[in-house]
From Swiss-Prot:
Protein's name in the database: Large ribosomal subunit protein uL14
Annotated SMART domains: Ribosomal_L14
Biological classification of the source: Bacteria, Pseudomonadati, Pseudomonadota, Alphaproteobacteria, Rickettsiales
Gene3D superfamilies named in the record: Ribosomal protein L14
Record GO terms (molecular function): large ribosomal subunit rRNA binding; structural constituent of ribosome
Gene: rplN
Length: 122
């Protein structure tokens, strides 16, 4: 579960390395974000020459969480780190590649583009 002030890694090649959650989108009482949710983030660490710079504010969709997700067959998928993919104003990925695995649950949230850019889909 991701809440405000949580630090996440960026799983794409947009140039950002670490981001901090500043708002969880989706209703007035939506306090925690889970896999596939959209959050507003601030860039905390970025590489020089990237598409984004430190201090910028973007939206991002969560692709990996430590909490994991329970599927309908009872299996659970958990990851070592929390990660997200940065989105632009039109809710399209900023980067052209997605590093690491993503889950099939993103398809139900209408993020098929992220799944096609990912190295592996679990």
């Amino acid at each position: 579960m991701i809440q405000m002030q949580s630090i996440l890694e960026v799983a794409d090649n947009s140039g950002a390395k670490k981001v901090m959650c500043i708002k969880v989108l989706g209703g007035s009482h939506h306090m925690m974000a889970k896999l596939g949710d959209v959050i507003v983030v601030s860039i905390k660490e970025a590489i020089p020459g990237g598409k984004v710079k430190k201090g910028d504010v973007y939206k991002g969709v969560i692709v990996r969480t430590k909490t994991g997700v329970v599927r309908s067959d009872g299996s659970t998928i958990k990851f070592d780190k929390n990660a997200l993919v940065l989105l632009n104003k039109q809710d399209e990925p900023i980067g052209t590649r997605v590093f690491g695995p993503v889950t099939r649950e993103l398809r139900a949230k209408k993020y098929v583009r992220i799944m096609s850019l990912a190295e592996e889909v679990l």
